[in-house]
Amino acid sequence: MQDASEPVINMPALPMNSVNEQHDRHEDLPEVGTTSVTKIINDSDNEDDENGMDLGRVASESLEGDAVVSIDINTEDSSLSPAKQENEKSPEGIEQKYQEEDLKDDKKSNETIATPVPDAASRASLEKQKSGLTNLEKSTHVVLIKCIEQLIQIKVCMKNEKMKNLMEQLKPLLQTECQFDKFLIVELFQYCFESSQDEVMNISLDTISKLASFAYFSSKDKTPASFGPPKSLLQCMVDMVCDSINDEVVDGNLQLNVVKALSAFILCSEQDSMLHGAILLNSVRKLFNVFLLGDSDTIQSVAQASLTQAVTVVYERLRASHTQSNSTSALPEEDASVTENWVHDEDEPDKKITLHSMASAGTSSLDHVKVDADDPAVTSVENSSIQDAFLVFRSMCRLAVRQTSPDKVSNIRSQAMRAKLISLHLIYRILEKNSDLFMDPTLQFRGIPALKGMTLVHASRQYICLVLSRNAVSPVPQVFEVCCDIFYLMVFSLRAHFKQEIEVFFREVYFPMLDLKNTSYNQKLHTLLIIQRICLNPRALVELYINYDCDRSSTTNVFEQLLFSISKVTTNGPSETISEDIEEILPSLESSERSSTPFLNTNSASLKSEVVQLTTFSDFQLKLKTLQCVLDILQSLSNWAESGLYLSRRGVSTDEQGFVGDYDALSRSDTPVTNPYYNGKQSFEANSHSSSSIALADPSQFESNKQRKKLLRTCINKFNYKPTRGLKMLSENEYVDINDPKAIAEFLFRADGIDKTTLGDYLGEGDEKSISVMHEFIDCLSFINLKFVDALRRLLQCFRLPGEAQKIDRIMLKFSERYMKENPSAFANADTAYILAYSIILLNTDLHSPRIKNKMTKEDFIKNNRGINDGADLDEDYLGFVYDDILKNEIAMKDDQELAAIAPLMNNFSTSSGFTTFTSNGRDLQRVACIQASEEMANKATSVLKKLLYQQKHGSQKTNVYYNATHFEHIGPMLEATWMPILAALSNPLQNSDYVNELNMCLDGFQLVVRIACLFDLDLIRDAFIKTLTNFTNLHSTSEIKLRNTMVIKTLLRIASTEGNNLKDSWKDILTIISQLERVQLIGVGVDETEVPDVINARVRRKNVNIGSSNSIRHVSGSTSRSTRTRSLSKPLSPEAVSELMSTEVVLSIDRIFTQTSSLSGSAIVSFFKALCEVSWDEITSSSDLEQPRLYSLQKLVEISYYNMQRIRVEWSSIWNVLGRFFNMVGSDENRHVAVFALDSLRQLSMHFLEIEELSLFSFQKEFLKPFEYVMASDTVVEVKELVLQCVKQMIQAKISKIKSGWKTLFGVFTFAAKARSEILISMTFDTLVNLFSEHYDTLMQQNCLIDMLISFTELCKNGTNQKISLQSLEIIREVYSSLSTMIKEGLSSKPSVNETFSKYVFPVLFAYYDIIMSAEDLEVRSRALQNLFYIFLEESDDFTEETWEVVSRKFIFPIFSIFGPEADEATVMLRDEEIRTWQSTTLVEALRSLVTLLTRRFDKLHNLLKGYLWLFSNCICRDNITLSRIGTNCMQQLLSGNAYRFEVKDWNLVADMFIELFKETTPHQLLLLETFSNGQGAPVYSENENTQLSHKRGGSLPETSRSISTSSISPEKQMEFRSMIRKCILQLLLISIVAELLDNEEVFNHIPHEHVLKITVAIYDSWQFARKFNEDKSLRITLLNVGFMKQLPNLLRQETASALLYITLLFRLLKTRDPLGKTETDQKIHKLLFPVCAEMLDMYASLVVEKHTRNHAAWQPVIATILDSILNLPLELFSENIHTLYFSCCSMIAKENLDDQLRELLKNYFNRVGHILLNLNAQQE
C-alpha cells in the first residue's frame, strides 16, 4: 500500500512542443496481440463466479514471486523453457503469455457466457438472422441479460426504483431481440455506478468490458440533450469507468475490473469504437493511476502490463494505418509555420532555466494543440493514429520530467519515482519498437495546424531532449540506467536527427560521468554498457567521427574524447585485490540490451534498495568493461575497414553499395535497425523544420576539415599562451584578418576554447590595436532593454576582468558608451554608467572576497554613489536594489560556478565514493552535495540545449548537415586520432595483471590495432604497439617470465603470421623476439646463459643507449645492467615458462612465419629480409667474443632464401640488394666461423641460382656473386680469401656453361686476389686465370670478358710479391694481343669499323700496359711493359689512323708523364718522392727516349699532336729535378734537331709560344711586391749601418758577422710561397740555358723563322729587365733578408747576365744571317732592339766600382766582351752606322780602373777601327 500523503499523479492533456525534423524509416516491427490482458481478467472473473477464486489470481501468479504458470503452447511442448519462464516475469512476457492463452481460453469463456464471442473479423462476416440481429448482437443481449439478472438479485439495485424499472423495461426487449435505444444501457450503468456498491460496480464493469470487446459502444452514437453536454456513448462509458474509482484506497477487485474494462476499450479494433484523443489519454491516465495506487502488487503488475499494452496498441494502429495509406498517399508539402517557444529568449540569459521549469511553466504553440473537427484530414484513420501516438508520447515525457524532491529520490518505491520509472520505460519502449515510424518522412501531421507537415521525430524532438537532460544524471540507478538506454536509441536510431543534441549529451553528461572521480560505480558501469553497445556499431562510430571530430562547427571531438574518457577508467583509480571467483563477475558485466520492462510494483525486486548502488563491483570490474569497450571499438573499426577494402578490391564503389552490410544490426536483441535510407535511397533533403540534412562522406573532405580544425585548436592554444602570436598564427592560416579589428573581435566573441582570462588581459591592453578590438568586441553584445547590472553580468561572462585598474578603466568606458547608446534614457550621461559600473565591480569584490572582513554596507554603497548622475543622485531604492542583487548573486563566471557546483563529484570523499550513502539514514551532507552537483549538471545540459534550440529556431546557425558513413578510408584517421589513449588502456593491464581473460582482451586489442595500422600504412602506430608488446615479453630477463609474457609472445607470433605483408620496419622487433625466444629455449634445455648472449642487452651496451631518452623505446625492455644479468643467472627459468615457450604451438608458429615468407608481397619480403639481416648481425656482434657465435638468424636467412628463390627477378633483385650487402658484412667478418658459414651458404645459394637460365644483357648473376668480390677486397684473413677462391673455382668447374654476367664479378674476385700480398692467393689466382686462358679462351671472348681478364692479369703484373708470376702474366698479355692482332687482321676482310675494332680489342691491351708502366712494383716488369707498349706503337701501328693516334696519345702516352702535370700537386710529389725518383731514374728516361723515337718515326700522323708533346717536354724541363731537366732538354733538342726540317711555320710558332709562356709562368713577380713579405714576425732586423753596408754590395755575400736566421717562426704558408719564388728563379735560368743550347744548333737555327726568334728574344729581354730591376732594388732585397727569405742577401745576378748575354748573342746572329744593308721591317726592328741595349750595357759596366761590385764586375765581363767582339765583327757599313751610338759608351770604358786585358784589347781594336774609318772618311773628304 502507498503512503496516502503522496499525491496522485493525474495526467491532464499536457501541452507539448515540437522541433520539426526528418529522418528515414526503419523496418516495420511485428504486431503484438492486443487482447491478452482483458482476456485473462475475463477468465479470472469466470473462474471466480464458478469456483469462488479471488479476482486477479491468475495475473498475480503470473506476475509476481517465483510462481510461474506453465502454459501449453502446442501439443509438442507442454511447458515453458527457462528462457520463456524468465520472459514471463516482465509485462512483455505477460502479454505474450496472454496471447498464447487466448486461443485456449476462448472456448471456456464462451461456455460460461453461453454465447460465443467471435473476433472482429468473424463478426464482420456473420449473417443476419430472421429477427434482423446478427450473432454479435445476440451475444451482447445474452451478456446484458445475464448482467440484469445478477443485478436483480442484489437488494440495493431493487431498492432503486428508477433502476428497477429500467431493468424491467430492458429485460423483455433483450429477450425478444427487439431493437432499442442503447442509451438505456448507459443509463443503467450510470445507476449502477451511482450506487457505490462494489458488488454492483464489479458486475457492471465486467459487463462493460465484455460489451467493449464486442465494440458495442460507438463514437457515432450521441447522448441525448437531457443527459448534459452532447458526447458520444463511447466517451460517456469511458468516463463512467474512469470515474468509478477515485484515487483513494479501494477494493482490489474493483481496480482489476476497471483495468479490464479500460483495456477492452483501448484494445477494441473496430474503427467506430476506437479510443482517440482525450478519451484515450483519460483511459491511459486511469491505468497509470491504478499502477501507482493498486491495492496489491498483482494489481499494479496487471495495470503496468495493460498500460504497456495500451501504448503498444496505439503505435501498432499507427503502423497499420500508415501501411495501408502509404501506397496511395503522396508526401505532402511541409509547412514551415511552426514556431517554438520552448526556449526562452536570449535577452534573459542569466535566468536559471531548467527543463523542469520549462515543462511546468513554459508555454508554446504546441501546448494548446487544437484539432479542427471540420478538417477532413482529421477524421482519417492515419491522422487520428499519429495524433494519438504523439499525445501518448508527450504525456509520458511530461510525466518523466516532473521534479522529484531529494527525499523522494532516496525512496525508490515512492509514487513519484515509480511514475518516473514507468514513464521512462514506456518512452524507451516506444522509441525502441517504433523508431522507424518516428523517422518516416511520409508519416506527417495533417489535421493539426501547429503540427502540419511535421514528422513524429520533429514533434517529439524537444521532449526527448527534455527527458534526457532532466534524468540523465539522476543518482537513482534505475532512472540512470533507462536514460542510458534512451540515449543509446538516440545515437543508434535517431542520430541523424539529433546531431547537435548528441554532442551536448556526450559533452555535458556522459563524458563527465566517466571523467569525474566520484560518480557512482553504477553510473560509470551503465555509461560503459551503453558506450559498449555504441561501440559495436561500426557505422555509428565512423559517423561520430566524421560528424563531430571532422566538423569545424563542433566544439567536441566526440569519438576522440570517447576513447580518452574510457581509457581514463583503466588508468585511474586504486588497484583492488581480485577475488578468486572473478570468473563469475564477467557474465553480470556483459552488455545486454533491454529486452523487457522490469516490474515496477511497490514490492518489486527491481526496486530493492540494495541495488541502488552496485557496491559489489570495484574499479577492477569497471576496468574490465572499459577494456571490452575499447576492444569492441577496435573490432568495429577493423570490420568496417576490411569490408570496405574487400569491396574496393572487387571494384565495387562503397557509395553505390551503401556500404551497410550488417553493421547497423549491432544489437543482439530484436531492436529494430534504423537505416538512414528509406527504400534504399536517401529519403529526404533538408527543409525548414530540419536542423540537419543527410549527405555522404567524402574522405578527402573530412581529412581537410579535421586538419583545419586541429590547426584552429593549435592557433587558439597559441592565443591562450601569447595573444599576439596567436593572432598572427590565425592570420597566417586565414582564420582571421589581422588588420581588421572587427573581424578579430567577432572571432574572439564566437570561438570556443578561448581562455577568458587571457582574453580579458588582451582586451584591456593599451595599444591602439587592442583597444580597437575591445571596442568591436563589446559592440558585438546587445544591451537593449537590459537592466544595468544584468548588462554588466552579460559583459563579464564573455571574459574575465583583468586585475589592472587601467585595463578595467578602458573596458568600463567602452561598456558605458555601448550601454547608453542602446539605452539612452537609463542615465543622464555615459559618465554615470561608467562610475556606477566601476562602483559595482568594487562592491562585488568587497562583498564576496574572503580576505575582506569589513564588508561594505548598503548605506556606504549609496553614499559612495551620490551625485554621479550629472550632479544629481540616483534613486536610493535603485541603488539599494543593485546592492541586494550583488549581495545575493555574485558577479562571477558561470564556468567557475559550474565547477564549484560539481566539485563534490570531482574531489575524493573521506567516506565511500559516489552516492553509496543513499542507503543510509538521514540527510547526509555528502549525499545532498552530490544531488546538487547532479542537478547542476542537468541545468548546464539544459542551458546548452536551450541555446542550441534557440539558434535552430532563429536560424542563427547554418543548416547542420549530417553525413552518412560510406567509406572505409575514415578508419585510418580515426585510429591516428585515438591511438594514444587506446595504447594506454591496453598497456596498463599487461604490466601487472595475471587475469587471463583481461590479458586476452588486451592482446586482442593490440592485434586489432596492428591490423588496422597495417591496412592503412600507419607506421608510427604500428611500430608503437609492436614495440610495446616486445617490451612486455620480458625475454631479456628469463627468470621473470610469467604467463602474461608468454601470452604476449604468442600474440606477436600471430601478428607476424597474419599481418606479414604490412609490418615493414616492425619485422625487426618481431624477429628480435624470435631470436630471443630461441635463446630462451636453449637456456631451457640446459645451455649456459653466457654462451647465448641476449641481442638486446648486447645492443644496448654497444650503443650506450640512454634508457631515459625518448628515442629508446626499442631498448627499454633490454636495458638491464651487467649486475642484473649476473643475478638472473642464479635464477633458473621456471618450468611453466619453459613448457609454454617450447610448446608445439610456439614452435609451429615460428616455423610458419619463415615458411610463409614465400607468400609475402614483393615489398614485404624485402622488409623481412632487411629485418632478419639486422637481427642476424646483432646476434653475431653480441657473440663475437665467443668461439661459436650465434648463427640462428643467419641460418634462417639462408633457409628463407631457398624458399624465395623462385620469385620473379624484379622482386629477387630487391631482395638481393639487402641480402647481398649483408653477405658482404658476414663474409668479411673477423670471426672465421661466421665468415666460413656465410661463404659456404653463399656458394650453395649461388650453385642453385646459377641453375636459373639468364638471358643476355642481364646482370642478375653479376649482382648475386658480388659478395665474393667484396670479401676478397676486404681486410679479412687469408684463410677466408682462400675459401672464396675455392668457392669460385668450384662454381667455374661445375657451372661454367651457365655463367654469363657473373664472369665480370668472378674476374673481380681474381683482380682483388691478384692485389693480395699472399703468395698462396697469388699463385691460386694465377693458376685459375691461366687455366681459363688456355682452356676457355673462346668462351670468355664470347662472353666479352677480354677487359676483365686483362685487368686480372694486369694486377698480377703490378703485384711485386712474385716477379716470376708478374712476368708470366705480362707474357700472357702479349699473347693476348698477338691473338687479338691476328683476329683483327682476319676480321678486316669484312671491313668492320676501325675505331670499333681498336676500342674493343687494342685499347684494353694498351691500357693494361699503361697501367703496368705506371703502377707496377717491379722495375723489370715496368720496363718490359714499356717496351711492349712502344713496340706496338712502333711496329704494330701501321693501321693506326690520325684519330687513333690522338686517342692513344691522350689516353696512354700523355698520362705516363701526368705526374709532371699541373694536377700533380706538391703534396703528392712529396709523398711519392722516393717512388718518383725511382721512376725518373728508370722508366721515365726510357719512356722519353722511346717517345722521341716514336715522334720521329710517326711524325706524319702525330704532327697534329705536336702541341701536346711539346707541353709534355716543357713540363719535364720545368721540374725542379736536375736529372729530369737534362733529360727533357736532351729529348727536346733531339726532337727539334732531328725533325727541324719537318717543322712548318705553325709548328715553330708553337715552339716559340711554348718558350714565351714558360718565361711568363716562371717569372716570380711576387718578389717585387712588398706586401708579399708583410708578415715578418720573428725575422731579424738589421741596423741602419748594416743596411748601409749591405747596400753597397749589390750582389755580394753577407757581412763578416754572419747571422744564422731561423725560419721556425715563419708560417708554413710563407715558407711554401718563398720556395715557389725560388723555384721560379731557378727555372728562369734553366729556360735561358735551354734556349741558348737549342738555338746554338745550326740545324734548328737555320729552320726556325727569324720572326719567331725575335719573339723568343723579347721574352729573354723581359727576363733580363726583371732581374735587373730586382737587383737594383736594395731595400727590397734587404727586406727579403729580414723576413728570412734567404740566409744571405738575395740577388738575380746570374739571370741578369745570362739573359743579357743570350739576348745580344741572338740578335747579333740574326744580323749575320740577314742582309747587312737590308732595310726591311725586321732589320729595322733588330737594330732598335740591339744597339741601344748594347750601349746601355757598356755604360752600366763602366759605372761599376770594382772594389764594391767585384762579383758583378766579373759576371758582366763576358757579356761586355761579347758585345765588343760582335761589334768589331760587324760589316763596315753597319759598324759605321752605329759609331755614334756606341762610341761614347766605349770611351767611358777607357777610364775604368782595373780593366781586364781582354776588354782592353777589344776596346783598342774598336777604337782602331773607328779611327781607320774616320781617317779614311777624312781622307776621302779631303
Swiss-Prot record:
One of its GO terms (biological process) is intracellular protein transport. InterPro entries: ARM-type_fold (IPR016024), DCB_dom (IPR032629), Mon2/Sec7/BIG1-like_HDS (IPR015403), Mon2/Sec7/BIG1-like_HUS (IPR032691), Sec7/BIG1-like_C (IPR046455), Sec7_C_sf (IPR023394), Sec7_dom (IPR000904), Sec7_dom_sf (IPR035999). Disulfide bonds: none annotated. It is found in: Cytoplasm; Golgi apparatus; Golgi apparatus, trans-Golgi network; Cytoplasmic vesicle, COPI-coated vesicle membrane. SUPFAM superfamilies: ARM repeat, Sec7 domain. One of its GO terms (cellular component) is ER to Golgi transport vesicle membrane. CDD domains: Sec7. Residues 85-110 have a biased composition (Basic and acidic residues). Residues 72-84 have a biased composition (Polar residues). Keywords: Cytoplasm, Cytoplasmic vesicle, Golgi apparatus, Membrane, Phosphoprotein, Protein transport, Transport. A motif (HUS box) lies at residues 547-551. Residues 1-54, 66-126, 1111-1131, 1584-1610 are annotated as: Disordered. Guanine exchange factor that acts as an activator of arf1 at the trans-Golgi net-work and is thus involved in vesicular budding and traffic between compartments of the Golgi apparatus. Activation of Arf (ADP-ribosylation factor) GTPases is essential for vesicle formation via recruitment of cargo adapters and coat proteins necessary for Golgi trafficking. Involved in the resistance to tamoxifen (TAM), an anticancer drug used to treat estrogen receptor (ER)-positive breast cancer. This is ADP-ribosylation factor guanine nucleotide-exchange factor sec72. It comes from Schizosaccharomyces pombe (strain 972 / ATCC 24843).
